[in-house]
Amino acid sequence: MKVSAALLCLLLTTAAFSTQVLAQPVSISTVCCFNVASRKISFQRLQSYRKITSSKCPQKAVIFKTKQAKKICADPKQKWVQDAMKYLDENSRTTKYSSF
């Protein structure tokens, strides 16, 4: 009887700890920009972009990906950055519709 009670306690303890481990959130890495491009990048070199708005980052930024797979941080307040995002948005829309 003592052995079965001890086994039951061990089983319940193991079950309690395993559910706590499973319930923990998955760690997602945050990408931040600490320096931004100081000059304009040719729109034709750009392939895509991603906005960085995480509160964990020191500043808001846009990461442009070039056709050569380089990633470049830029200040989203600058006019050329806004124009580049608009250019990429329009090109991606045109590409989607022209494939029919």
Swiss-Prot record:
**Any signal peptide, and if so, which residues?**
1-23
Q: Where is the protein situated, by its record's location annotation?
A: Secreted
Q: Name one GO molecular function term.
A: CCR chemokine receptor binding
The task this protein performs is described as: In response to the presence of allergens, this protein directly promotes the accumulation of eosinophils (a prominent feature of allergic inflammatory reactions), but not lymphocytes, macrophages or neutrophils. Binds to CCR3.
Q: Which family does it belong to?
A: Belongs to the intercrine beta (chemokine CC) family.
Keywords of this entry: Chemotaxis, Cytokine, Disulfide bond, Glycoprotein, Inflammatory response, Secreted, Signal
Q: Which GO terms describe its biological process?
A: antimicrobial humoral immune response mediated by antimicrobial peptide; chemokine-mediated signaling pathway; eosinophil chemotaxis; inflammatory response; positive regulation of cell migration
Matching entries from SMART domains are given as: SCY
**Alphabetical list of Gene3D superfamilies matching this protein:** 2.40.50.40
Where on this protein are sugars attached? T94
Q: What would be the name of the gene that encodes this protein?
A: CCL11
Could you tell me which cysteines form disulfide bridges? C32-C57, C33-C73
Keyword Signal in annotation: yes
Specify the species: Equus caballus
InterPro entries documented for this protein:
Chemokine_b/g/d, Chemokine_CC_CS, Chemokine_IL8-like_dom, Interleukin_8-like_sf
- In its UniProt entry, what is this protein called? Eotaxin
Q: Does the keyword Secreted apply?
A: yes
Under the cellular component aspect of Gene Ontology, which terms does the record hold? extracellular space
